[in-house]
Amino acid sequence: MYSQQPFPPFAFNAGLIQDPANCHFGGYTGLGHPQPFSFAFSTLKSENGDSGVQGMGDCSAPVMPWNSMASFDHHGQVETNQQGNPIRAPSPTPTLSDSRIKVKEEVAHETDSGEESPEPKYPSPPNPSLYYPNTWTGSPFWQVNPTAGNNSNSTNPMPSQTLVKNGSLPGNTTYPTPANQSPNTPVDCVVSSMESSRCSSANSSNGAINERATTIPNGGMVDGGQSSDNEEEVPSESEMEQFAKDLKHKRVSMGYTQADVGYALGVLYGKMFSQTTICRFESLQLSFKNMCQLKPFLERWLVEAENNDNLQELINREQVIAQTRKRKRRTNIENIVKGTLESYFMKCSKPGAQEMVQIAKELNMDKDVVRVWFCNRRQKGKRQGMPTVDENDGEGYDVGQTMASPPVGHYSLPQVVTSQGYMAAPLGSTPPLYASAFHKNELFPQPLPHAMPMGGHIG
């Protein structure tokens, strides 16, 4: 009635593995892998004795072991190499149940004999099964390398393999194996070889550490916290006091001054000390830490002074060379420049960095010279007791102003100062006031307080 589109027959590709029970396909094997492999999974015998097969009919599938990483049973299968010759399959790995039965038999044998074994009663866990993630040859399954028996002739080393514990994930506990390790090698041999190599590497590393600890150059610390002979010990206070006395006695006997000693240290060792430092060392006025730092230099100087007769000549020659070096000349400022600086000083006695740069540019001078002049000028004003512009809140001094006395009682006679700065004749017993003769806005104004009283009470 309806035409159905024909479908191609179902066929297995090369990557599928047939089920060992052929009841599902009626005995039809289909297209399998070119290699004559058919993996038949054996049943696992439980602890109660039964085979663990629960099912009905011929199609009941065998019960698989719980271990997901267990090796396959190659019983009844034939494996061939690349040339087509049959090879021997690796021996099956003992299962967990076999190991338990073996342990029970050993325990029963020990209880029957009545003797305790020197070995621990609880045996070690069963040997882990082998798992090789990488193939040994180009084929998709394991094949024995024909040159595996002769390791010396093999040119290309095999990739490193891993040992995975039975029933655990691949990344849980892995053990690196040698590149030329064969899958037929027992697990005990592999583990023992790894333990021996690990112990040998640990012993070699410990030996290298001990060797480095015992041979430390340049006066380093040795094992046990003890210092080497090259490291100088810290002297005590009594030893430091005795050394200071000996230093002073030898220095005076050889004819050296304290300044000569400080200068000689600079000539010989590149670190010059002042005469004050040497004096304080001899009188034990330095701190103990500074004296400990200075003592090695003075000890070397004593040895050099006793053995070298030309040390005094060397010191004198160096002093002459130092005195003949060019010294910075004193800065001379012209009177016109001084007057300009005074005018700037009256405006602001402590200018900032930008103002100093501007003043230096206007006067064609160095900035440091301007800075030093302002510092000296402020110190000069402090010595003379003259108030500066900053002390008067930035106000300039103006002597050409009218100064009147405050009213005292009912009689007050104001005194007026002329614009020329000369004061009028006093009246009565009023004390005179002598003002400077400089004009307004002229240089060097006199710092006089404002509104000074000019008259007194008459009566």
UniProtKB/Swiss-Prot annotation:
Task: Region Disordered: list its residue ranges.
Answer: 78-131, 216-238
Domain of life of the native organism: Eukaryota
Residues within the DNA-binding region(s): 326-385
Ranges for the POU-specific domain? 232-306
Q: Where in the cell is it found?
A: Nucleus
What UniProt keywords apply to this chain's record, in alphabetical order? Activator, Developmental protein, Differentiation, DNA-binding, Homeobox, Nucleus, Transcription, Transcription regulation
Sorted alphabetically, which SUPFAM superfamilies does this protein's record hold?
Homeodomain-like, lambda repressor-like DNA-binding domains
GO MF, one annotated term: DNA-binding transcription factor activity, RNA polymerase II-specific
Family matches, as CDD domains? homeodomain
Example GO CC term: the record gives:
nucleus
Q: Where is the composition biased (Acidic residues)?
A: 229-238
Fetch the Pfam families from UniProt: Homeodomain, Pou
Q: What is its main location?
A: nucleus
What the entry lists under InterPro entries is as follows: HD (IPR001356), Homeobox_CS (IPR017970), Homeodomain-like_sf (IPR009057), Lambda_DNA-bd_dom_sf (IPR010982), POU (IPR013847), POU_dom (IPR000327), POU_domain_TF (IPR050255)
- GO BP, one annotated term: negative regulation of activin receptor signaling pathway
Q: Please give the Gene3D superfamilies that the UniProt record associates with this protein.
A: Homeodomain-like, lambda repressor-like DNA-binding domains
**Complex formation:** Interacts with components of the transcription complex that assembles on the vent2-B gene, including vent2 (via C-terminus), smad1 and smad4. Forms a repression complex on the promoters of the gsc and mix2 genes via interactions with the nodal/activin signaling pathway transducers foxh1/fast1, gtf2ird1/wbscr11 and smad2. Forms a repression complex on the promoters of the nodal/nr1 and siamois genes with the maternal factors tcf7l1/tcf3 and vegt.
Supply the name of the protein.
Answer: POU domain, class 5, transcription factor 1.1
| Native organism | Xenopus tropicalis
Q: What is the lineage of its organism?
A: Eukaryota, Metazoa, Chordata, Craniata, Vertebrata
